[in-house]
Amino acid sequence: MPNLGVPELLIIALVIFLLFGATRLPNAARSLGRSMRIFKSEMDEMKTDGDKKELAEKQAPTAEQQQAQDLAQPKSEQPNEHNA
């Protein structure tokens, strides 16, 4: 695959400028920028959702272990008035 140098990139930019015109290029760039921001925010949201799920999965076994420990420990009986 050939390497693109500065002259080739300038020719490509000129062709794009001629195809889309001076009025549509800024709008296209703005639209592309908005799309990139939305994409990045969605990716960050997906990462935080994944972190929350991992944290919940780590905490869930500890809650189950706590319930198992509560069931395994015998409850001490309080002396009643009837037993005295």
From Swiss-Prot:
Region feature (Disordered): 42-84
PANTHER family the record matches: SEC-INDEPENDENT PROTEIN TRANSLOCASE PROTEIN TATA (PTHR42982:SF8)
Family: Belongs to the TatA/E family.
Main localisation: membrane
Xref: HAMAP family: TatA_E (MF_00236)
Name the UniProt record assigns to this protein: Sec-independent protein translocase protein TatA
Compositionally biased residues, Polar residues: 62-77
UniProt KW Transmembrane helix keyword: yes
Localization terms from the record: Cell membrane
Start-end of Basic and acidic residues biased regions: 42-57
Top-level division of the source organism's lineage: Bacteria
Entry function: Part of the twin-arginine translocation (Tat) system that transports large folded proteins containing a characteristic twin-arginine motif in their signal peptide across membranes. TatA could form the protein-conducting channel of the Tat system.
